Amino acid sequence: MRSIWTETAQIPRRNPLTGNKRTEVVVIGGGMAGILTAFYLQRHGIHVVVLEANRIGSGQTGYTTAKITSQHNLIYSKLEKTVGKEAARLYGKANQLAVEEYGKLIKRYSIQCHYEQKDAYLYSVQESEKLLKEAESAKRLGLPASFVRETKLPFQVHGAVRFTGQAQFNPLEFLRDISAGLTVYERTRVVKVQGHEVVTDKGVIKADKVVFASHYPFVNVPGFYFAKMYQEKSYVLELEPVEALDGMYLGVDKKAYSFRNYGDRLLLGYGSHRTGKAPAENPFSTMKQVAEHLFPQAEERGRWTAQDCITLDGIPYIGTYSFFRPDWYVATGFGKWGMSSSMAAAKILSMQITGKRTPYDAVFSPQRHHLKASALKFAGHGLESVKGLAGGTMPGAINCPHLGCRMVWNRYDKRWECPCHGSGFEINGKICAGPAQQSIPFID
């Protein structure tokens, strides 16, 4: 399954690792977070190596809708209640600075990536009260937010939260240029990490520090990320021709859609659900019906799925991997907001690795304890994991090599999925999504 980004951006191939090497920092993962972290570390004068199991940007970065925004759904009104006003303010500031940093980099290095400044909108066709609260919270926290009654969508809304000065781009075109001066080894899968040794299927690299930017951290102990994070799947339909929308849009109703343009194409998003729990309806069929109604002149040009890591309190894990591994670092749990979160993570981690502190360290710390924000999701995540593990003991079950949960078949995405932690496998058992690191035996 290919996306508009993988179809339109050509990133030069890099050679795999050969033999054993020594470096200051190893970054595991060649997506947006990993490449940006390596980029900033190199600017600090650090010798850094990036290891990518497939190709640069071939993971979730290649299947995003690529909105660069600090508007993360109805998050600020929630964070003010669960983690407090100051932590919510710092979360918003880190992401808004990330939005602005993309613009600075693209201008400074003359990166051709179809970058466009756009306002971002949260909309509802049912009510306006929760949008008013979100706009008030975001504005109170210093973000460029306001409540509006009208949008440029081809249907009437009850209201919307508008964030000005946000942006969109082609993420793989951006990665192509920003990674040009980095040492990246593609088609080099990390098998395990032991202290300061990163063992791959091509050789071993010894490093002073290790960064896990591989979407979902695959080392279970220490860290225990499998117990405090799960994955969600969503669906994207590419349509053409569609007149360019003025803005980027995300619905907040139970059955809502996202919209953004790319030239005369439109990316229509829909259908978020926990990976391994297939929806009752076919998301692509639903989107096709909506597209035929709203954009009758348009034809389908492509379709794909995205998969995102969700933390229990809604804030990414960025910082030291564990108290027991102070030289390991992690960037994960970006939710649906990988572009701004990747930049925020890169800035934070590059400072921490070079021995400096930032005002955002405590907010994003993987060792934080936001009990009020996490309790309900922890219970729900635990229940789903227990069910998956119990299913793995049944006769004839196809088990995930990560922790043994029973695999389920996603008939819409045509692949095997783990309902516990979100690993994915092609029909023949070949691994295509972590945290599992091995394929499963061939399935008839």
Q: What is the role of each PLM region?
A:
Residues R2-T8, L74-K81, G103-F174:
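Flavin (FAD/FMN) cofactor-binding and adjacent substrate-gating region
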Residues M1-V25:
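Extreme N-terminal leader/targeting segments of oxidoreductases
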Residues R43-Y63:
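Glycine-rich FAD pyrophosphate-binding loop
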Residues S137, A160-K209, A213:
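Helical element adjacent to the flavin cofactor pocket in flavoenzyme catalytic cores
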Residues V242-L245, H273-Q307:
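Flavin-binding catalytic cores
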Residues T23-V50:
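N-terminal Rossmann-like FAD-binding beta1-loop-alpha1 element of flavoenzymes
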Residues D253-K254, F284-S285, F295-F378, G396:
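C-terminal catalytic lobe of FAD-dependent flavoproteins
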Residues L237, T393-D444:
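Rieske [2Fe-2S] iron-sulfur-binding domain
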